[in-house]
Amino acid sequence: MEAPKFVNNACPIPNLNLSRTEEIELDFPPLQIQQKIATILDTFTELSAELSAELSAELSAELSAELSAELSAELSAELSAELSAELSAELSAELSAELSAELSAELSAELRERKKQYAFYRDYLLNQENIRKIYGANIPFETFQVKDICEIRRGRAITKAYIRNNPGENPVYSAATTNDGELGRIKDCDFDGEYITWTTNGYAGVVFYRNGKFNASQDCGVLKVKNKKICTKFLSFLLKIEAPKFVHNLASRPKLSQKVMAEIELSFPPLEIQEKIADILFAFEKLCNDLVEGIPAEIELRKKQLDYYQNFLFNWVQEQKKNSLSTNLN
């Protein structure tokens, strides 16, 4: 208590030298009383040290627990968000790919079966013997060459550059077989009405029924029925079976020329029966085509359903984690 009063603070470094310490005057009670006071002060010092240690330990533990809880919650939330996002992306990609593959496989298999059915019934219904079984044994048939019942023309040269520079609504049909044979659309209209087109080069011998305004490229032949005994749709179905048989495959590019097309012979039942058969086959063909067009739409719809349920489950899991963390903190 007394020593600090004699410290020399005038120096740069405060000090209390030995000679000055020896000169400090102190008052003392009797020895017995000194000993009692010293014992009391020692006990008090020990208690203070113990209390300080206990308080320090408690505060450290409490602070550590709070910091640990906060850091754990924060870290858990961050990790959960990162892992959930990563997992969600991976699952979404895997499930979407798997779903697309499964749907494509299923729908493609369905399409193949439909096409087989269509080909079977088309060939069955266009067979003379079967037509007589269905409509009567005495049904008469007439045989014509294509040149006897149709006007035969060929398309003109229409380049891709011409299509780009003359955009419009009317399709240009070419030797292509995808996209219904359409190469593009222009303002011009070379044909308007009910026609049959066939590919003359490349994928030669592919036949299409047309009804409306259109144009044809130079690799596309065009037939216009001129005989009132012939149904254009029925003729198109017959040619889909017969025309490929006359394709010249010895050249570098397969061909079915106007001259060869003109010589093809075909047999026809009465017009009324032609129309009935054509309506049946046309409806069946449309059903197959609708299925083809519906595949991408079906896949897209299933993907949207997948995304919805993924998001729903992800949000539910996040909510459960938040509730669990809140309960633990409380």
Swiss-Prot record:
Keywords: DNA-binding, Restriction system. CDD domains: RMtype1_S_Fco49512ORF2615P-TRD2-CR2_like. Pfam families: Methylase_S. SUPFAM superfamilies: DNA methylase specificity domain, MgtE N-terminal domain-like. One of its GO terms (biological process) is DNA restriction-modification system. Transmembrane segments: none annotated. Coiled coil: none annotated. The keyword DNA-binding applies. GO terms for molecular function: DNA binding. Induction: Detected at low levels after 6 but not 96 hours growth (at protein level). Contains two DNA recognition domains, each specifying recognition of one of the two defined components of the target sequence. Belongs to the type-I restriction system S methylase family. PANTHER family: TYPE I RESTRICTION ENZYME ECOKI SPECIFICITY SUBUNIT, TYPE-1 RESTRICTION ENZYME ECOKI SPECIFICITY PROTEIN. The specificity (S) subunit of a type I restriction enzyme; this subunit dictates DNA sequence specificity. As the bacterial DNA is methylated on this sequence and this is the only type I methylase in the genome, it is probably responsible for all of the methylation on this site in the genome. The R subunit has multiple frameshifts and is probably not expressed in this bacteria. The methyltransferase is composed of M and S polypeptides. This is Type I restriction enzyme MpnII specificity subunit. It comes from Mycoplasma pneumoniae (strain ATCC 29342 / M129 / Subtype 1).
